[in-house]
Amino acid sequence: MDRQNIRIRLKAFDHRVLDHSTREIVNTAKRTGATVRGPIPLPTLIEKFTVNRSPHVDKKSREQFEIRTHKRVLDIVDPTPQTVDALMKLDLSAGVDVEIKL
């Protein structure tokens, strides 16, 4: 019989919020009897933006800003129906993007 997997990808700008949400998902899955692989940290995406400090002159004077997107992956192996229900009812922090694939 084919093994059922649930893959959960989490993205957030703040790594502390991301780790807290990951811990909540892992604890919920383990409490309902499923096995969890991960969390696996994926490479952090760093987007840098360079802008002129002055609107008029001084082209050499610039300022840089960056956005860091932290990512994690979890695999839930052989989830029970209770696991799926508990994950659907789970309320995660704002600012965490969750993608679920079956």
UniProtKB/Swiss-Prot annotation:
One of its GO terms (molecular function) is tRNA binding. PROSITE patterns: RIBOSOMAL_S10. The keyword Ribosomal protein applies. Keywords: Ribonucleoprotein, Ribosomal protein. Involved in the binding of tRNA to the ribosomes. Belongs to the universal ribosomal protein uS10 family. PANTHER family: 30S RIBOSOMAL PROTEIN S10 FAMILY MEMBER. This is Small ribosomal subunit protein uS10. It comes from Caulobacter vibrioides (strain NA1000 / CB15N). The gene is rpsJ.
